[in-house]
């Protein structure tokens, strides 16, 4: 890549200020409309061809960040209204007393501690889809600049996306935590060192990918945005160091509710930013080349915020992933099942919740925390993905709590086994598909000048790009190949 083109591409994603939170929610909620529409159609028509699955769950999201980026409300109508009409017509044609309808209206009551929940698969998969689409789309003019990552202060769709990616990883990671949980935790150096060793080994593949990405970017003279993570750091390093730090914190995480730890660390970091010289140190451009730390200060210090998001994401697993109420699962992990009789007797029954109830309470709590920040802008700094500060953490968590609740309510509104083959396939190899999309993004950027690509051609390229990793996910899933990184 020529140095002049590299500079132009770097300028194209630099010094941006983002957009409004309301617009971000309007655009990203297209995923909810797509999921609702898919369930309505599958409920009415039975199994859908893969092409319709792909159109509803991938192309509609692509349209929301490109062609319909300025009018997402119209796209919501185009997606939902036809499928709703088909569903209502089918509802009146089909006899209400039919066994099929009676079975579907019964609420799912699982006896499994960790059942596979359709709405969680949809949430994680569609979050990956919009992330994969955005990392390439951002290099084309058709992708609005207000959706791209902001320079320092402000909100954008991609800023929200990177935090949501980490949150969803924390949520998924909590499945293993619940499986391995014992109610009578006792610290021992042997088990502690074993945990650190296991987590380090788990981190190695991701850290190697981070190193490969760094070397590739430098060798190929690929465009990079230094104020995003620094000179050497990249998102794979952030993901790779998470298990190591979690292993170090393991004794505390086993004794103190995770949401308290996540919020506590985030508040302590916010105080350090505002009451010491840390904020000035991170944002200063004059100290960039002084040391390895200053070269990568954004990546190193934003890691604290992402760690908090991950830990809070883990805290959701105890009531989101479980198939039934467990003791105090709103605030801590437990395998002790709470029956209806026990629930009435328990003095702490408020903290023993079903999934929907827990999500309602989480939405209220984190939105209040986020609103408290909004009303105290003079006391706190604005939202900053570059810093991953406390306002950013609360924004990401409150958003994901809300969207998880919406996915859950959609599944309850349209009950039944209405799985999407595309979403299942992407979810089953999520991190690997994310890696492939990064490689494809690099290849496309090295092959063409994205800045001079027409909107029509950009959409064609993005469709081909999305089709490539979707087909790969479908192939791997069909062959039962699951690549865990």
Curated annotation (Swiss-Prot):
Pfam families listed in its UniProt record: GWT1
Membrane topology: Multi-pass membrane protein
InterPro entries (UniProt xref): PIGW/GWT1
GO process terms (BP): GPI anchor biosynthetic process
Gene name of the encoded protein: GWT1
Main location as per UniProt: endoplasmic reticulum
Protein name: GPI-anchored wall transfer protein 1
One annotated GO molecular function: glucosaminyl-phosphatidylinositol O-acyltransferase activity
Organism (species): Candida albicans (strain SC5314 / ATCC MYA-2876)
Pathway(s) annotated for this protein in UniProt: Glycolipid biosynthesis; glycosylphosphatidylinositol-anchor biosynthesis
Localization per record: Endoplasmic reticulum membrane
Keywords for this protein: Acyltransferase, Endoplasmic reticulum, Glycoprotein, GPI-anchor biosynthesis, Membrane, Transferase, Transmembrane, Transmembrane helix
Record-stated family: Belongs to the PIGW family.
Chain ranges passing through the membrane: 48-68, 73-93, 123-143, 152-172, 200-217, 229-249, 259-279, 300-320, 359-379, 390-410, 431-451, 457-477
UniProt GO cellular component terms: endoplasmic reticulum membrane
E.C. number(s) listed in UniProt: 2.3.-.-
Function: Probable acetyltransferase, which acetylates the inositol ring of phosphatidylinositol during biosynthesis of GPI-anchor.
Glycosylated position list: 103, 180, 417
